[in-house]
């Protein structure tokens, strides 16, 4: 268990002022200081590995670091990209695949609500509503935008969640996740290559120009996090 309220590191390694503790504190920012201090003592921080599966277990789960690709658990259809600060499980969520190493905070739902009180319940309801609206937006996108825009938005989501320019997915992987026919995903990637947005290698996508990718994407994609600004600038240099 951890105690983000006292990050001095005097009694436990978990109390050190590490970036994951700060990420955890920021993720629950809507709660008052007292509610956060009580509720966050209940949970634990769990490391995850790139390429590993994510399976919801009915507890509260929040991404602290890393990028998680969510799917519907049946056909493998894309349901969203989760990154630091995103609530991914509230007594049942979507399974997925980790696209990078990372960290997840988990805590029992009942105990969290008991400690955080009404604030905690409202926080979880707001998180669930955000997930629902995100999935609705993706459904509208799939119905109203072409393959090029959908693929560009998908890649931009992952890039802005990770700050990286290499995505460990093949064209066929992306086509399956977005429910695109083989001819459609091939044509979309060819168009993005011709525009200078990306380069494809075996089993990977290498992003070359974020601005070009954004110009071709539809309106629903993750805003760039200020925390990634320096990393993105350094990687692009």
What is each of the regions a protein language model found here?
Residues 1-49, 86-88:
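Cyclic nucleotide-binding regulatory module and flanking cytosolic helices
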Residues 45-46, 53-64, 79-80, 96:
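His/acidic/aromatic-lined binding-pocket segments of jelly-roll/cupin-type domains
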Residues 56-74, 84-85:
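Glycine- and acidic-residue-biased ligand/ion/polar-headgroup-sensing regions
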Residues 59, 67, 101-103, 204:
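Structural motif
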Residues 75-133, 137:
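Cyclic-nucleotide recognition modules
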Residues 118-182:
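Polybasic "coupling" helices that flank or enter modular domains
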């Amino acid at each position: 268990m951890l105690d983000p309220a006292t990050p001095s590191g005097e009694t436990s390694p978990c109390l050190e002022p590490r970036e994951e503790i700060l990420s955890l504190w920021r993720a629950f920012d809507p709660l008052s200081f007292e509610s956060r201090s009580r509720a966050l003592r209940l949970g634990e921080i769990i490391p995850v590995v790139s390429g590993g599966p994510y399976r919801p277990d009915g507890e509260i789960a929040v991404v602290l670091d890393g990028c998680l690709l969510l799917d519907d658990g049946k056909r493998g259809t894309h349901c969203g990209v989760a990154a630091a600060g995103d609530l991914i499980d509230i007594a049942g969520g979507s399974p997925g695949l980790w696209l990078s190493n990372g960290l997840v905070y988990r805590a029992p739902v009942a105990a969290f609500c008991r400690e955080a009180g009404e604030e905690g319940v409202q926080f979880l309801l707001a998180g669930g509503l955000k997930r629902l609206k995100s999935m609705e937006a993706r459904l509208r996108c799939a119905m109203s935008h072409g393959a090029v825009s959908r693929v560009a938005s998908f890649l931009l989501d992952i890039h802005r969640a990770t700050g990286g320019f290499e995505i460990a997915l093949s064209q066929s992987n992306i086509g399956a996740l977005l429910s695109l026919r083989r001819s459609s995903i091939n044509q979309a990637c060819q168009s993005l290559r011709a525009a200078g947005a990306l380069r494809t290698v075996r089993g990977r996508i290498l992003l070359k120009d974020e601005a070009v990718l954004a110009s071709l994407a539809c309106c629903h994609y993750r805003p760039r996090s200020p925390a990634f600004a320096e990393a993105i600038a350094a990687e692009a240099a």
